[in-house]
């Protein structure tokens, strides 16, 4: 795709990041309270950003096409400046739970996070870097944008003398991309989501360089 720019993150990108998260992970399939969905999405994004030391964004004009968030062990760089007191209100810490249905839907989200913890349990010392969040918009897939973003992150990790990384993904995402880029699937865990009566496969992928 022509005219794509790969750049650092800006505060103005965060709303587009949220939209890409909702589209990629289909949170709205099992969280139907719109206010709750907003809080879950923004909290997930903030947590991912605050745990990262490197972010690269692909954009064309004013539109974000994709982004990658990474962490290398030992790098103290952070992006906390994106969340100043002036915009902290956009990232509430209290969930707007109104009824039992909301509680059940939150429980589904927690199940997925617990599955990721289970996948990594006992393996933490195998890795010195990770990809916290990596999304390319559906319209921009297959155009080399994901591969370019990944290469930026690998170059960064190499500069930090990292040797192995991990990431979590699941079958809502294009996990075949990681296989095509030389990643290995180290483990997988099935999660039953009662609200949609289906299983979600979660994966731990690794890469050594």
Where are these regions (language model features)?
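A short beta-loop-alpha structural element at the N-terminal edge
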Residues: 4-19, 72
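Active-site rim helix/loop that mediates acceptor-substrate recognition in acyltransferases
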Residues: 34-55, 69, 118-120
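Conserved acyl-donor/pantetheine-binding loop and adjacent beta-alpha core of acyl/acetyltransferases
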Residues: 74-129, 194-197
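Conserved active-site alpha-helix within GNAT-family acetyltransferase domains
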Residues: 117, 147, 171-188
């Amino acid at each position: 795709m022509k005219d794509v720019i790969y750049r650092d993150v800006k505060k103005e990108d965060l709303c587009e990041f949220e939209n890409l998260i909702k589209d990629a992970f289909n949170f709205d399939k099992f969280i139907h309270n719109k206010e709750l969905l907003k809080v879950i999405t923004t909290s997930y994004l903030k947590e991912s950003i605050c745990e990262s030391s490197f972010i690269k964004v692909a954009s064309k004009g004013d539109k974000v096409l994709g982004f990658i968030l990474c962490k290398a062990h030992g790098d103290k760089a952070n992006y906390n400046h994106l969340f100043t007191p002036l915009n902290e209100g956009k990232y509430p810490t209290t969930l707007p739970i109104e009824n039992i249905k909301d509680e059940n839907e939150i429980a589904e989200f927690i199940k997925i996070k617990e599955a990721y913890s289970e996948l990594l349990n006992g393996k933490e010392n195998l890795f010195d870097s990770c990809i916290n969040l990596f999304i390319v918009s559906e319209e921009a897939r297959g155009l080399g944008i994901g591969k370019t973003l990944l290469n930026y992150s690998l170059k960064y990790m190499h500069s930090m003398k990292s040797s192995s990384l991990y990431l979590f993904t699941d079958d809502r995402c294009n996990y075949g991309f990681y296989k095509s880029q030389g990643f290995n699937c180290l483990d997988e865990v099935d999660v039953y989501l009662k609200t949609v009566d289906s299983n979600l496969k979660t994966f731990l992928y690794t890469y050594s360089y």
